[in-house]
């Protein structure tokens, strides 16, 4: 699929894709994903053609932008690395997120409170989100999936070939997809203009790491406060006092007390 020049992959986006290891696939290849393989490295890792990755991102964005009601798009991620990206994508595009475990019957059992009737489903991994894809096939909902070269392609209508196991790769693909959707909707008016949202916002962050960083910052702040208090105390102790002033003030006070006693 050849894209117009306005939709072509830029050098900056290509650098981002390579930096996030989007092009590094698994060692096994599913037969339907062979056209996306650029070459196989000596260590057995299959390299994905990022030009085809970008073509599928543009195609998926055009499908999403064609749906009038943004909330009719459901984005799913059972994989931990994709849950933050799914929530951010939903907040920027208006889609409906399902982060975490997909409850069976979400698309088929209308009695459940979480029942949904979406017009499009986007999943992070066809393996971990297999339940969502299976239920979508029952009710004829098209599916877009972030697909590695070893991912199953059953009931997947649009597969975006990429590394769907790394946190940076997953976050960047969702970021590029959100940016392209906003461009097609006209929210980002100029394709040359940069989006104010950074890709880092879509990357997974470990809660324990966040707590450790907060604790280290608190310790650093406490250390700085202690050093300031010690420095102030040292300056107070090092200041020289005038003994003559003390003596004069003592004599004056004694004279005033004697005069008051005579009265």
UniProtKB/Swiss-Prot annotation:
It comes from the Eukaryota. Residues 213-223 have a biased composition (Low complexity). The keyword Iron-sulfur does not apply. InterPro entries: Ribosomal_uS2, Ribosomal_uS2_C, Ribosomal_uS2_CS, Ribosomal_uS2_euk, Ribosomal_uS2_euk/arc, Ribosomal_uS2_flav_dom_sf. One of its GO terms (biological process) is translation. It is found in: Cytoplasm. The modification N-acetylserine is found at residue 2. Pfam families: 40S_SA_C, Ribosomal_S2. Required for the assembly and/or stability of the 40S ribosomal subunit. Required for the processing of the 20S rRNA-precursor to mature 18S rRNA in a late step of the maturation of 40S ribosomal subunits. Belongs to the universal ribosomal protein uS2 family. This is Small ribosomal subunit protein uS2. It comes from Clavispora lusitaniae (strain ATCC 42720). The gene is RPS0.
